[in-house]
Amino acid sequence: MLCSWRVKLKLLLATITLAVLLSWLYLFVGSLEYGRFLLLPPCLGEQPSRDVEREALASQVRRVEEENQQLRMQLGQVQAEGSDGNPQWAASAEDGPPLGGERNNRTACPEQRMVRKCELLHVAIVCAGHNASRDVVTLVKSILFHRKNPLHFHFITDSVAHQILQTLFQSWMVPSIHVSFYNADDLKPEVSWIPNKHYSGIYGLMKLTLTKALPSNLSKVIVLDTDITFATDIAELWAVFGKFSEKQVIGLVENQSDWYLGNLWKNHKPWPALGRGFNTGVILLLLDRLRRLGWEQMWRLTAERELMSMLSTSLADQDIFNAVIKQNPALVYRLPCFWNVQLSDHTRSELCYTEVSDLKVIHWNSPKKLRVKNKHVEFFRNLYLTFLEYDGNLLRRELFGCASLPSPPSDQLQQALEELDEDDPCYDFRRQHLTQHRVHLFFLQYEFLALPNPTDVTLVAQLSMDRLQMLEAICKHWAGPISLALYMSDAEAQQFLRYAQASEVLSARRNVAYHIVYKEGQFYPINLLRNVALANTQTPYVFLTDIDFLPMYGLYDYLRNSIQQLELPHRKAALIVPAFETLHYRLTFPKSKAELLSMLDMGSLYTFRYHVWPKGHAPTDYAKWRTATVPYRVAWQPDFEPYVVVRRDCPKYDQRFVGFGWNKVSHIMELDAQEYELLVLPNAFMIHMPHAPSFDISKFRLSAGYRGCLQTLREEFHQDLSRKYGAAALKYLTAERNL
């Protein structure tokens, strides 16, 4: 071995000497072309233009310096190999420095294989539950922000995350993004036998099964934890696959804490690992090679052997990956540590970077997440918050020069937008109707399990940020399940999250579903919001209300009893809850119908909108309601818009109506067209609380164009209703003309 090294060294020295001689001859010949010998004093030769001479000489010197630099680099690599006889452990630029060594690990490394333009990059993520589904959105945003290539995300999910992420990506409609889902329940038998103390539970072991879970024709994939933030183009990480040797199959960053050294506390006994071990928050997997090696059998045998003494894993899949690598060190490619800057309590991650430009990937691998202790944590937190609150609509940009695969929903939307007439006075209304809003279902933990109760009912409402203060009051008045659609920006959604987590009332409830519909466009998409909240209920019946109303105490139980007594499962009926209002922000809420009637007589309460829009609720017949003891039937009348309890499969709200006006009227009209009975409940009531006028109602009142467009939409709705229900819908058109 020593002899071989000396031969290589002599060969390189001879090469360098020859290169210097050739360079000298090259300069000599070149100088003759300019009419003088460069090694002679200037006065002895002919002197053409000094500028031309200086430029030619500088060019030749630069070439020689570049050649010498390349030769020195090759010599350094040979010396590094000869120092211990093992090129895998040489301190080359592509392996990155060890934590205790040189701190500068910028990417001034030997030339690496570049990712082809439009090459499809594959990313696998294990995601389960409501919280992880929320975290993964920030990861995806950071990837999309920097990316220049098409991406294919492979999500291993439970049923909750599947529903959330599938809806999110379908509504996001980002070009050149492909998404596949794999059922984690199918993979649980593969790892359920492994005891795991990590907070991630059984899902923290799922990455071991990727060779089986992912398609057999997928040869390589980047695997990420959900608590990752990218600060660079993920294609740079994908390019590292080109550096793997023939034996290397897994790319990992060294663990940046002393966990696997076993010196964190007394009697600490970690799983076996190579040196400091490796962190599995960022993994490069060559799946085809792993399958040929028999990866499944390899990790199983290792886990079984180690569990005999360790009894359980502490860091989930990471312990098993490290145990396998301990037995097979040739399998691992050491990624530079800036590809996984770990921010847990015991890490030494500051050794991985000296400047911002050194950062590639940040890993919040502590249960404390953003509250972790690190001297640069404020900088990292700000970088994370940038993507947390970043407007995801801005990421719907095309990749120039890369053809997207056909997407029927996207193509249909584009065609509909192209058919709009920009000179139409109502163009903005029609454009808003076609707007595709991002939707994040079940933004917070939701654990309501619908029992087989045929009379159960969910309160359904929608709101924006300015009505957030109503949530606690509604939760105090309504004990049953609630489905809410919230219209917010990305930043507002995070404000809401902090508000809900800090509220004792809201954080104590697990049967309230919050669905975020992200802002886009100039009008409030009120009926879209209602449809989102309605579509994601789990009970047979729904109470369709607005966020400004407080239901009477005990209304939830009263409605369930009424549904049963009226045998609603066997008839098509809508139960009307009479609406009242107060002008007082502080109200002693009536505990019974008798108290409400007393307050009504005293002028503390009023029938809803009696002085502004009496037609909206007059058909409820409040005079009859005062003395009624049993439900009574009322007939539909023009502009009637009561709040009702109906079956969950009722007609959807017409989404052409945005902003203010006719959004509930059109819905009640369609219920009547489908021959729903309208039954007023005698002992139910709700009270509207005062608030400042919305922006949309102000536009309605001030803009003649707004009101004109609303009238146009009403006429078009009547025409569509007539086509849908035939002669039965003519009465609505007649009633409209008689107004």
From Swiss-Prot:
Cytoplasmic compartment segments: 1-10
Annotated region (Xylosyltransferase activity) at: 121-396
Entry cofactor note text?
Answer: Binds 2 Mn(2+) ions per subunit. The xylosyltransferase part binds one Mn(2+) and the beta-1,3-glucuronyltransferase part binds one Mn(2+).
Query: What are the boundaries of the region Disordered?
Result: 80-105
Q: In which pathway does it act?
A: Protein modification; protein glycosylation
* Cofactor(s), by name: Mn(2+)
Q: Spell out where the chain crosses the membrane.
A: 11-31
UniProt-recorded name of the protein: Xylosyl- and glucuronyltransferase LARGE2s
